[in-house]
Amino acid sequence: MRVTALVPAAGMGKRMGADINKQYLLLEGKPILAHTLAVFELAPFVDDIYVITPEAEIPYCREHVVEQFGFTKVRGVVAGGKERQNSVLNGLRAIDASDEDDVVLIHDGVRPFIPTAVLKRSVEVATAEDGALVAVPAKDTIKTVEAGIVTGTPPRENIWLAQTPQTFRYGIIRAAHELAAAEGFLGTDDASLVERLGRQVHVVMGDYRNIKITTPEDMLLAEAFLKSVNSER
């Protein structure tokens, strides 16, 4: 069984207000994407990495991230699509998976603080079950709202905030994405596509520091998290 990390990094980062895409912004002198890839590069149970980025940025990604930082597990840099879901399908089609039971970890390129232990647990669960979704319990009260009016308050104990990685056996996630593409269905995450197949996705406890860096405020948090991580080493 091979374990492959599929890392979508094709977002335009409009909310960041920067001149370059968010995945290439520097965090202590190193692109965010490089911090993320380093986690998979150092994880002994991960065999391969595929990065998905806008087609025009493939040469930049190869030179300034993959080659500059010496990521030996990166097998390919794949052109992304219009939506994240299209990008992931492109990545799945590019993976050299000879066995449908090979495991694929799908992880956002701008989530550099995922603990290795969470990755390992995700692989274990995905191997035994239909899939593994990393998530954390909601801390805040959640409201449903229509036209500016509160319409309900879901029980907080049932609300979990989805993160990545979302991890599946290759045959399951490939089938889910191909079906969604054929039917023109656009989901909010990879797990939702697997759920449409009638499969049961199991939750793996995540980490509240596993943030998706999309705004300037997130960058401030990320800098603080990185200093904390460095001080613990």
Curated annotation (Swiss-Prot):
Give the reactions, separated by semicolons, that this protein catalyses: 2-C-methyl-D-erythritol 4-phosphate + CTP + H(+) = 4-CDP-2-C-methyl-D-erythritol + diphosphate
EC number, as in UniProt: 2.7.7.60
Q: Where is this site: Transition state stabilizer?
A: 15, 22
Q: Name one Pfam family in it.
A: IspD
Q: By its UniProt entry, which CDD domains does this protein fall under? A: CDP-ME_synthetase (cd02516)
Q: Name one GO molecular function term.
A: 2-C-methyl-D-erythritol 4-phosphate cytidylyltransferase activity
Pathway(s) annotated for this protein in UniProt: Isoprenoid biosynthesis; isopentenyl diphosphate biosynthesis via DXP pathway; isopentenyl diphosphate from 1-deoxy-D-xylulose 5-phosphate: step 2/6
State the PROSITE patterns in the record. Answer: ISPD (PS01295)
Swiss-Prot/TrEMBL GO biological process terms: isopentenyl diphosphate biosynthetic process, methylerythritol 4-phosphate pathway
Fetch the InterPro entries from UniProt.
IspD, IspD/TarI, IspD/TarI_cytidylyltransf_bact, ISPD_synthase_CS, Nucleotide-diphossugar_trans
Residues the record marks as site: Positions MEP for the nucleophilic attack = 156, 212
* Keywords, comma-separated and alphabetical: Isoprene biosynthesis, Nucleotidyltransferase, Transferase
Q: Which NCBIfam families match?
A: ispD
Q: What does this protein do?
A: Catalyzes the formation of 4-diphosphocytidyl-2-C-methyl-D-erythritol from CTP and 2-C-methyl-D-erythritol 4-phosphate (MEP).
Question: Family, per the entry?
Answer: Belongs to the IspD/TarI cytidylyltransferase family. IspD subfamily.
Name of the featured protein = 2-C-methyl-D-erythritol 4-phosphate cytidylyltransferase
